[in-house]
Design a protein with these regions (language model features):
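Polytopic transmembrane helical bundles with strong interfacial aromatic enrichment
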Residues: 1-406, 412-413, 417-420, 424-430, ...
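Single conserved hydrophobic/aromatic residue that forms the stacking wall/gate
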Residues: 437-446
Length: 446
C-alpha cells in the first residue's frame, strides 16, 4: 500500500502541473480544448490523491511499521478509533490531508462556478492547481508520508497522548480545510484581475467560498478551544498561543471580507478594498501553515521542529509579492462605481467594522512575531503574554461589539442622527430592562 500511495502522489504532481500549464497556456492561446482538459485533470487528481489517502489510512489500520510515518505516530496498543487522528498527527500526514482538502474543494468550486466567473475559470483552475502543486512537491521531495524504514520495528512510538481527545477528530481537519479553503476565493479574485474583468464577476463565488472557509475556520477554532480547556489545563479556552493566533488572524480578515463584499455586491463599492482583504486573509492563512511547520515561534500546537519552515516562508513571500504585483498592475480597474455618500451610513459602518477587525489582526500579529523581532534585534527573546493581548485587543473588541449592535440599524447611503436615535430607542430600552433584571438580584443581595 505504501508503494501505491507514493506512486499516487507522483501521478498527482504530474496532473497538477499539467493543469497549471494547460489552464494558463490554453487561455493565452485561446484553445478551449486545452482549458477543458486542464479542468478535467483536477477531477482525476482528486481521485488519485484520495487513493493515496486511503493507502496511508490502510497502512495505519494494518500497523505497517515499515512506513516511517506509521511507526512514528501509532503502535500496537493504539485503538483503531484513533487511526484518523494519527493520519494527520504529523507534518507528512497533515500535508496529505491539506492536498486532499484542496483537491476536494477545488473540484467542487470548478464544477459549481457561477456563470459570471466562467470567462476566467481557466485562471482560477491554474491558481488552485499551482497551490496544489506546491503541497504535492513538498510531500514528495521533503516530507513523504510513504517513506519506509530500512528495518521494520516490532512496534511503533505511539500517538501523542494529547491527541486522544474527541475534539481531535474534527478540530485539525476543520482548521486545515478552512485555511486551505481560502485559496478558493483568493483564486477567483486573482483570476478576475488577470482576466481584466470589471472586477464584479468574482463576487458571488468569492463570497460563497469565503463563508464556507469562515465556517470551517470558526468550527476549528471553537473545537480547538474546547480541546485546550479540557486537555492542556490552562484554566481557560484561549491562551493567545502563536499557532492559535495564526489561525485566528485569517478568520478576522475573512470576517471583514465577508462583510465588505456585501457592500460591493449591493452598491458596487469597496472593489479595491475587497481585493486587499482577500489577499490579506490568504497571506495570513499561509502564515498559519508556516507557523505549524517549523515556524520560528514555538507553540504547543505546532508539529514540532521541521526543515519545512524555510520552504513555507518562501511560499508565503511569493503568496504576498505576486498578488501585490497583480494588484498594482490592475490598480486603475479597481475604482468603485459608487462613492461613500455619508459617514452616517451602513457602508461607513461596514468600513469601520473592517478596520476594527484588521486592527485586532495586526495587534495579534505584532504580539506573535515580536519575540522573534526582539531576538533578532537585541539578542533577547521577550515573551508576549496574555495581558498584552487582553489590554490592547480588549477595547477594540468592545468597540466591535458596540458597532455590531448599531450597524444593522443604520440605513444604506445616508442617515441622520434623528433616524439613528429612533432606531436605537427600542433596543436600548430592552437592553436596559434586561440588564437591570439580571443584575438587580445580585445588587440587592450584597
Amino acid at each position: 500500500m505504501a508503494s501505491l500511495g507514493a506512486i499516487g502522489l507522483c501521478i498527482a504532481l504530474v496532473l497538477s502541473s499539467y493543469s497549471v500549464i494547460g489552464s494558463f497556456l490554453g487561455k493565452s492561446i485561446k484553445i478551449s480544448a486545452l482549458e477543458e482538459s486542464a479542468r478535467r485533470a483536477v477531477y482525476v487528481l482528486l481521485l488519485v490523491v484520495f487513493v493515496s489517502t486511503v493507502s496511508l489510512v490502510t497502512a495505519f489500520i494494518n500497523r505497517d511499521f515499515q512506513v516511517a510515518y506509521v511507526a512514528a505516530h501509532s503502535n500496537l496498543a493504539m485503538p483503531n478509533i484513533y487511526t484518523w487522528v494519527a493520519f494527520y498527527a504529523g507534518n507528512e500526514g497533515s500535508l496529505l490531508f491539506i492536498a486532499l482538502a484542496l483537491a476536494v474543494l477545488s473540484s467542487i468550486a470548478i464544477r459549481l462556478a457561477p456563470a459570471r466567473s466562467r470567462e476566467t475559470l481557466a485562471y482560477t483552475v491554474g491558481i488552485l492547481m499551482l497551490v496544489e502543486t506546491f503541497f504535492l512537491a513538498v510531500m514528495i521531495f521533503m516530507a513523504n508520508p510513504f517513506d519506509t524504514l530500512p528495518l521494520t520495528p516490532s512496534d511503533g512510538e505511539g500517538i501523542n497522548p494529547l491527541l486522544t481527545h474527541f475534539g481531535m477528530f474534527f478540530h485539525p481537519p476543520a482548521l486545515m480545510s478552512g485555511l486551505i479553503g481560502l485559496t478558493i476565493p483568493f483564486a477567483f479574485a486573482m483570476s478576475s484581475l488577470i482576466g481584466k474583468q470589471s472586477n464584479d464577476e468574482w463576487v458571488d463565488a468569492g463570497r460563497t467560498w469565503g463563508i464556507i472557509s469562515w465556517v470551517l475556520l470558526a468550527s476549528g477554532l471553537l473545537l480547538g478551544s474546547w480541546w485546550a480547556y479540557t486537555i492542556l489545563g490552562w484554566g481557560g479556552f484561549w491562551f493567545w498561543d502563536p499557532v492559535e493566533n495564526a489561525a485566528f488572524m485569517p478568520w478576522l480578515a475573512l470576517t471583514a471580507f465577508i462583510h465588505s463584499i456585501m457592500v460591493q455586491k449591493r452598491r458596487g463599492m469597496f472593489r479595491m478594498w475587497n481585493i486587499v482583504l482577500i489577499n490579506v486573509a490568504f497571506a495570513l492563512a499561509l502564515y498559519g501553515m508556516f507557523m505549524n511547520r517549523g515556524g520560528p515561534v514555538p507553540s504547543v500546537h505546532s508539529f514540532g521542529a521541521s526543515d519545512l519552515g524555510l520552504v513555507f516562508l518562501s511560499f508565503l513571500a511569493a503568496g504576498i509579492l505576486i498578488p501585490f504585483l497583480i494588484f498594482f498592475w490592475r490598480f486603475n480597474s479597481l475604482k468603485s462605481t459608487q462613492s461613500l455618500d455619508s459617514m452616517l451610513s451602513r457602508e461607513a459602518a461596514f468600513l469601520l467594522n473592517n478596520l476594527l477587525f484588521l486592527g485586532i489582526a495586526f495587534v495579534t500579529l505584532w504580539g506573535t512575531v515580536y519575540p522573534l523581532l526582539s531576538k533578532l534585534g537585541s539578542g533577547e527573546e521577550i515573551t508576549v503574554a496574555r495581558p498584552f493581548y487582553d489590554q490592547v485587543n480588549g477595547p477594540l473588541m468592545l468597540l466591535l461589539i458596540l458597532l455590531m449592535g448599531i450597524g444593522p440599524l443604520i440605513p444604506w447611503r445616508q442617515a441622520n442622527l434623528a433616524s439613528i436615535k429612533r432606531a436605537l430607542l427600542i433596543p436600548t430600552m430592552v437592553g436596559t430592562v434586561s440588564y437591570t433584571h439580571l443584575t438587580l438580584p445580585t445588587i440587592c443581595s450584597v
